[in-house]
């Protein structure tokens, strides 16, 4: 019985703790593009808190800074290059439909 109980005990493995994405000296500001760009996806969307590994307060400040940068035209609202490629190829195919009676 003693031996079977010992089989279920797992050895504690040490793991490397990840560095926080925002250091104590970093200032969250709409002008700090190098910091803000780390928290935006390729499409220009704000990444979630779980993906960023930020605290609630940090995520709120990052979101406000990104929105201010967008309003002041420092960041684009959308960064969807595929949309433009697709619209050029389908531009000739669209037309008015006529109803035959």
Swiss-Prot record:
| Taxonomic superkingdom | Eukaryota
Name the GO cellular-component terms.
Answer: chloroplast; mitochondrial small ribosomal subunit
Q: Which InterPro entries match?
A: Ribosomal_bS18 (IPR001648), Ribosomal_bS18_CS (IPR018275), Ribosomal_bS18_sf (IPR036870)
Please name one Pfam family that this protein belongs to.
Ribosomal_S18
Localisation = Plastid, Chloroplast
Q: What span is annotated as the signal peptide, if there is one?
A: none
User: A Gene Ontology MF term for this entry?
Assistant: small ribosomal subunit rRNA binding
Q: Which UniProt keywords apply?
A: Chloroplast, Plastid, Ribonucleoprotein, Ribosomal protein, RNA-binding, rRNA-binding
**Any single biological process term in GO:** translation
How does this chain assemble? Part of the 30S ribosomal subunit.
Q: Which family does it belong to?
A: Belongs to the bacterial ribosomal protein bS18 family.
* NCBIfam families reported in the protein's UniProt record: S18 (TIGR00165)
The name under which this protein is listed is: Small ribosomal subunit protein bS18c
Q: Which gene is annotated as encoding this protein in its UniProt record?
A: rps18
């Amino acid at each position: 019985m003693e031996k079977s109980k010992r089989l279920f005990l797992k050895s504690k493995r040490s793991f490397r703790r990840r560095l926080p994405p925002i250091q104590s000296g970093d200032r969250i500001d709409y002008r700090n593009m190098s910091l803000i760009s780390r928290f935006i996806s390729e499409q220009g969307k704000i990444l979630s808190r779980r993906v960023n590994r930020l605290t609630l307060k940090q995520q709120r400040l990052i979101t406000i800074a990104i929105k201010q940068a967008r309003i002041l035209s420092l960041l684009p609202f959308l960064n969807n290059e595929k949309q433009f490629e697709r619209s050029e190829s389908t531009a000739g195919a669209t037309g008015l439909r006529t109803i035959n009676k």
